[in-house]
């Protein structure tokens, strides 16, 4: 798989998905990474610590199929340090090549098959006005436990 995306768009998507990446990986090193795969509208980045999963889509031009898991922190640092412009990421068997302008590097990838499978929620979604949600959270947060 290969995709092209604007640096700022990719950096924003990484920042959101990275919030769910496990800080301690324990027995599953794949949880320290982001799964990247093509989607209908571009590229999908998924981060998970098995309790929280965040999926983000970023507009991009994609070629090919497949997915891979890149080390989240390292990938984020690389993308943030790039000059603004188009970033090209190409995945081969066990590496991701990142190119932007004259910059080129490669990262080792992990198998996407080891990444946890996500189950889609069943039933219809719910819409809540932002103000109502904010007010509800403001009322219950003081009672929430700080130990968990």
Where are these regions (language model features)?
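Structural preference for solvent-exposed beta-strand-turn elements
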Residues: 1-148
């Amino acid at each position: 798989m290969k995709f092209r995306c604007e640096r700022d768009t990719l950096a924003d998507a990484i920042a959101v998905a990275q919030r769910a990446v496990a800080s301690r990986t324990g027995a599953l090193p794949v949880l320290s990474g982001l799964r990247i795969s093509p989607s209908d509208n571009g590229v999908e980045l998924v981060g998970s610590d098995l309790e929280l999963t965040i999926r983000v889509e970023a507009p991009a031009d994609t070629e090919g199929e497949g997915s891979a898991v890149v080390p989240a922190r390292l990938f984020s640092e690389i993308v943030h340090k790039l000059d603004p412009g188009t970033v090209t990421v190409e995945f081969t068997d066990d590496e991701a090549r990142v190119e932007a302008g004259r910059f080129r590097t490669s990262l080792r990838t992990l198998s996407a098959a080891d990444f946890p499978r996500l189950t889609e929620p069943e039933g219809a979604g719910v819409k809540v006005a932002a103000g109502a949600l904010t007010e509800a959270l403001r009322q219950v947060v003081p009672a929430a436990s700080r130990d968990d």
